[in-house]
Each structure stands twice: as C-alpha cells, then as structure tokens.
Amino acid sequence: MTSEFFSAQLRAQISDDTTHPISYYKPEFYMPDDGGTAHLSVVAEDGSAVSATSTINLYFGSKVRSPVSGILLNNEMDDFSSTSITNEFGVPPSPANFIQPGKQPLSSMCPTIMVGQDGQVRMVVGAAGGTQITMATALAIIYNLWFGYDVKWAVEEPRLHNQLLPNVTTVERNIDQEVTAALETRHHHTQITSTFIAVVQAIVRMAGGWAAASDSRKGGEPAGY
C-alpha cells in the first residue's frame, strides 16, 4: 500500500475536472463502519513523539461493563467482515478481512508521525471518527504542510468526506460555498452532514518550539508545559 507503483495507479484514476461513477473505481469489496474511537498526539521534551489511536469499535463497545474494573469491553470482533453479509450496494465483503487465527481486523485508524529529511519530527497527527479518519487526517496534513495553515487552522478548517460506497461527498455545514459549488461542477453529489466529520488532534514543530491543536468539534483543548 505504501509503494510508489500502487500510489501511481491510484493517482492515474483521478480526474481534476470530474468525478466518475462507482464502477469506474472498480470497488471489489466493502468494509464495515467503525466508531467508538479516541486519538492522542504527544511530543516529549527530548523530541520523541507518539501518535496513538485506540478504539472499542462501536459506541460503548459491546455495551458490557466489567463489574470489577468498570472498564467497558470492546466488540472489536465486529470489525471483521462476515462471509454471509453483502452491503446495500451489492458489494461483497473483503476476504482480506475474514476472521482467521491470530489476525487483526482491518481498520480506518492511521496514527501518523511526519518526519523531515533531517530526521526531525515535523508533525504528529491522527483522528477519531470511523471511516472518516483517513480523509480527516490527510486533510489536516495537506492544510498544514502543503497550504501552510497553522495547526489550529488546519484542524478547524471545515472538512469533506467521500468513501465511494455510498458515492456521496459529505460536507460540513460551515464549508465555503465555493468548495461545494466546485464539487458539484465536477459532478459530485454533495450532502451536508448533520453533525461533523471526524475529530483530529495534531502537534506541529515551529521555529521556536511546538504548536498543538485539539479539535473543538468535540470540545478538546491541547495541554503542554
């Protein structure tokens, strides 16, 4: 998945002036939704960094709480695909995600540490939000490293999301109308989300130290000393 050849194949399918029907992207399998996730980005005094995403899968996991520890138990096994379940678009489950001994289910989680050519950590970032995690994390990276937004702006900027199945581009309510219009010009079917798209936590190296942002979509605030 990280090879330049695979990236080039995906890039070749992108058209700047239009989107395409689902069949153009040749979706072979679908992945179940997930949720009940939290992310933490940390940088220590010595410059070492941790990007950690944890999950109990769905909201409140298995909805079972240990009477001894009070800890909610997860239902992570539900993240595996079932051989007998096809989604509403008629796309079969992925064999790569079937249950096998010693195997972990596929996940949208992508805790990320960006490192410069000098070997120094430049950005620590990740998100919670089920299938929206990957795009939300990528957008924060793009806004900061490519567009030069400060870390707070990169995290707070209104987001969009499309996971192909369903082929609907979801946008946050406060997104710039020019963005929505440009998407529709390219034949995207847009839909305003009733809530928000993922929750991002990020830390970025600055000339004089570090800057951190915790997504206000979930009432977060960064902490440091």
Swiss-Prot record:
Question: PROSITE patterns, alphabetically?
Answer: G_GLU_TRANSPEPTIDASE
**Catalytic site positions:** 37
Classification via Pfam families = G_glu_transpept (PF01019)
Cite a single GO BP annotation. Answer: glutathione catabolic process
Segments spanning the bilayer are none
The record's InterPro entries line, in alphabetical order, gives:
GGT_CS, GGT_peptidase, GGT_ssub, Ntn_hydrolases_N
Could you cite one Gene Ontology molecular function of this protein? glutathione hydrolase activity
Binding residue positions for L-glutamate: 55, 76, 107-108, 129-130
Further information in the entry reads: Corresponds to the light chain of other gamma-glutamyltransferase family members. Has no catalytic activity.
Family per UniProt? Belongs to the gamma-glutamyltransferase family.
Q: What is this protein called?
A: Glutathione hydrolase light chain 1
Instruction: Give the originating organism.
Output: Homo sapiens
